């Protein structure tokens, strides 16, 4: 069985954001605007996306 994945794109800059938000973007493998990252769809990744929801956009949401 294939694991579910989620694709996210960074749409906001981490400049003048809290260090924890910058670290969350690094954890999501994002570092520059309009970069796309594909990660395994797990509760921890979903929580990280929720933490920086104002800086990222979910491109593919298999759960919806």
UniProtKB/Swiss-Prot annotation:
Cited CDD domains: Ribosomal_L30
GO molecular function, one term: structural constituent of ribosome
Annotated InterPro entries: Ribo_uL30_ferredoxin-like_sf, Ribosomal_uL30_bac-type, Ribosomal_uL30_ferredoxin-like
Gene3D superfamilies, per database record: Ribosomal protein L30, ferredoxin-like fold domain (3.30.1390.20)
Pfam family, one: Ribosomal_L30
GO cellular component, one term: cytosolic large ribosomal subunit
Domain of life: Bacteria
Keyword Endoplasmic reticulum recorded: no
Alphabetical UniProt keywords: Ribonucleoprotein, Ribosomal protein
Any single biological process term in GO: translation
Entry's family note: Belongs to the universal ribosomal protein uL30 family.
UniProt subunit comment: Part of the 50S ribosomal subunit.
NCBIfam families xrefs: rpmD_bact
The protein's name: Large ribosomal subunit protein uL30
Protein source organism: Methylorubrum extorquens (strain PA1)
